[in-house]
């Protein structure tokens, strides 16, 4: 059946699972940022309306440019550079995000950093996993995206839990933990790729 073929593909390609897990953690970071955005902007000192929060969320349009940049740079054979820059952006976005309740501009910078990093990283991951087997592209995509969206769900759930128990600091720490996880998986995977 199709499900057996997907499980078989996943078992036979640990590289696919590593890239998918790294991508899932990245999507988890972004999901945490956007889930908690309502909490941050809807409370003191901003008290934004739902409409205003939605407008602020349009910062995500930067993803259009990050996708284009990532695709071109990966096409030049600079996958490792793209990975390092993307992970660096996601890691260091925690610094401006930490000050979200003190400055809207600094918060916006943090959101842009995390969104740019994740979107470009997603393009990189898809580029890498599609090289595994061009004939199995649809099945590879199914495995990758299933794990990828699981990360988003975990990020949203984690953000709600962190906010309820630890407020905004808890959300930022969660994002940092996810980002460190991305770093470890990504570096391990690149070492394995170099050996192979």
Identify the role of each PLM range:
Residues 1-20:
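Juxtamembrane intracellular "pre-TM" segments in multi-pass secondary transporters
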Residues 24, 58-62, 112, 142-150, ...:
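Transmembrane alpha-helical cores of Major Facilitator Superfamily
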Residues 173-196:
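Multi-pass alpha-helical transporter architecture, strongest
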Residues 130-168, 174-178:
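A late C-terminal transmembrane helix in Major Facilitator Superfamily
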Residues 65-79, 163:
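Helix-to-loop junctions at the C-terminal end of transmembrane segments
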Residues 22-34, 42, 117-118:
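Conserved extracellular-gate-facing transmembrane-helix segments in secondary transporters
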Residues 80-125:
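C-terminal transmembrane helical hairpin of 12-TM major facilitator-type secondary transporters
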Residues 44-62, 139-143:
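Loop-to-transmembrane helix entry
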């Amino acid at each position: 059946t199709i499900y057996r073929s997907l499980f078989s593909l996943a078992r036979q390609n640990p590289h696919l699972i590593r890239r998918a897990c790294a991508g899932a953690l990245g999507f988890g970071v972004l999901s945490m940022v956007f889930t908690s955005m309502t909490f941050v902007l809807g409370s003191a000192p901003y008290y934004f309306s739902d409409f205003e929060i939605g407008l602020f969320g349009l910062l995500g349009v930067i993803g259009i440019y990050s996708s284009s940049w990532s695709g071109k740079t990966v096409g030049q054979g600079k996958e490792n550079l793209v990975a390092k820059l993307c992970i660096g952006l996601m890691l260091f976005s925690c610094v401006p995000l930490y000050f979200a309740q003190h400055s809207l501009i600094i918060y916006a910078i943090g959101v842009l950093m995390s969104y740019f990093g994740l979107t470009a990283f997603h393009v990189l991951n898809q580029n890498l996993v599609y090289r595994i087997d061009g004939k199995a592209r649809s099945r590879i995509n199914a495995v990758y995206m299933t794990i990828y969206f699981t990360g988003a769900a975990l990020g949203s759930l984690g953000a709600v839990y962190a906010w309820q128990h630890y407020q905004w600091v808890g959300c930022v720490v969660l994002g940092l933990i996810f980002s460190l996880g991305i770093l470890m998986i990504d570096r391990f995977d690149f070492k394995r790729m170099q050996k192979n």
